[in-house]
Amino acid sequence: MAMTDTEFHQLADDMFQAIETAIETAIDEQDADVDIDASGNVLQLEFVDGSKIVINKQEPLHEIWVATRFGGYHFGYVEGKWLDGRNGGEFMPFVQDSILRQSGIELSL
């Protein structure tokens, strides 16, 4: 059965909240310098060097798109997991690794 828009937004919002919570913990524990801007369908992370990671919800496709300085990625929800459409990698480990590579900040997601 296809996912409804309401289900998509609930899953995506839960994931956005988990990322925000992990970053706030890193700010507290590691004195990490990250600006978090959550606005509508977009979660933007800006690091001390000015680089950004932008995560946004693509409602018509029921996908999460991520832009890092290393490239753009599309994640779809498959069997209870957000998976990269190209290589099948899971979303949360990908975000964790991208933040580490881009900023040196270690998150617990």
From Swiss-Prot:
Q: Which CDD domains match?
A: Frataxin (cd00503)
What is the similarity comment for this entry? Belongs to the frataxin family.
User: Which Pfam families does the record associate with it?
Assistant: Frataxin_Cyay
> Is Transmembrane helix a UniProt keyword of this protein?
no
- Report the Gene3D superfamilies cross-referenced here: Frataxin/CyaY
Question: Which Gene Ontology CC terms are recorded?
Answer: cytosol
Sorted alphabetically, which keywords does the UniProt record give? Iron, Metal-binding
Which residues constitute the signal peptide according to the record? none
Concerning HAMAP family, the annotation shows:
CyaY (MF_00142)
Q: Which SMART domains does this one have?
A: Frataxin_Cyay
Question: Per its UniProt record, what SUPFAM superfamilies does this chain match?
Answer: Frataxin/Nqo15-like
| Entry keyword Metal-binding | yes
- Reported function: Involved in iron-sulfur (Fe-S) cluster assembly. May act as a regulator of Fe-S biogenesis.
List, alphabetically, the InterPro entries matched. CyaY, Frataxin/CyaY, Frataxin/CyaY_sf, Frataxin_CS
What's one GO BP annotation on this UniProt entry?
Answer: iron-sulfur cluster assembly
> What's the name of the protein?
Iron-sulfur cluster assembly protein CyaY
Q: What one GO molecular function would you report for this record?
A: ferrous iron binding
